């Protein structure tokens, strides 16, 4: 019970940081979140919210002036992704970026081979990732609850791996990539409706500062 109270207290604090000051820009919010959350809070918030990518981004924040520097770097990258990739839903979380591709954009039903048309969008994403090279990237596959949990886990892993392989083929450094499959374990909508299941079938891309960028940010902060 005490742990649950702590988790939700952290969630409320996070929401206050992101929503309580409407006049803040994304960079300022990122600095505040990083200063107030930290890795432990990020992990707990991710667990409570049921979204590993969001928790990872919150936990990776450094906060303060350095966090604001990283936030500006991410703002520019997020703007380019939103502008150039029509099929991507882009969120700025802390000092990172979460991109969501509905699986229907990338894959046919129950398949892990990329649709031909989706390769254009992933090529554009690769160009931006290569331009902003001082980041780590997690690729997270997700499914709905149709079929067995074991099958869904395997499908989500194969799809995340397929996206990773395509990015590497477009010269994204594989050392930057972490590939994960979560199967049906992290739904973002109800699996009781067709619309909800469609939202749950997705690939998420989490982007956050690597050690090099954090070092530069710390030096800029003095």
Predicted regions mapped to residue ranges:
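Periplasmic peptidoglycan-binding/anchoring modules of Gram-negative envelope and division proteins
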Residues: 83-84, 107-141, 165-168, 198-200, ...
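Amphipathic, membrane-active segments
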Residues: 74-105
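Periplasmic OmpA-like peptidoglycan-binding domain that tethers envelope proteins to the cell wall
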Residues: 142-216
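C-terminal motif of bacterial Sec signal peptides marking the signal peptidase cleavage site
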Residues: 16-20
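Extracytoplasmic/secreted proteins, especially bacterial periplasmic and envelope-associated proteins
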Residues: 31-35, 39, 56, 76, ...
């Amino acid at each position: 019970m005490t742990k649950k109270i702590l988790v939700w207290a952290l969630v409320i604090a996070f929401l206050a940081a992101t929503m309580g000051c409407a006049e803040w820009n994304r960079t300022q919010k990122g600095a505040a979140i990083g200063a107030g959350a930290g890795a432990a809070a990020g992990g707990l918030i991710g667990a409570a919210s049921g979204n590993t990518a969001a928790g990872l981004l919150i936990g990776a924040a450094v906060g303060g002036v350095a966090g604001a520097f990283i936030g500006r770097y991410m703002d520019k990258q997020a703007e380019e992704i939103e502008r150039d990739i029509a099929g991507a839903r882009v969120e700025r979380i802390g000092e990172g970026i979460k991109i969501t591709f509905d699986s229907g954009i990338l894959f046919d039903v129950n398949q892990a081979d990329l649709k031909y048309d989706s390769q254009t969008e992933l090529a554009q994403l690769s160009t931006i990732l290569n331009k902003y090279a001082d980041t780590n990237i997690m690729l997270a596959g997700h499914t709905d609850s149709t079929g067995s949990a074991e099958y869904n886990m395997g499908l989500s892993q194969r799809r995340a791996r397929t996206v990773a392989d395509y990015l590497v083929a477009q010269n994204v450094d594989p050392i930057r990539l972490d590939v994960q499959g979560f199967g049906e374990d992290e739904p973002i909508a109800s699996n009781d409706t067709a619309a909800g299941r469609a939202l749950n079938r997705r690939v998420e891309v989490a982007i956050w500062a690597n050690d090099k960028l954090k070092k530069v940010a710390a030096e800029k902060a003095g």
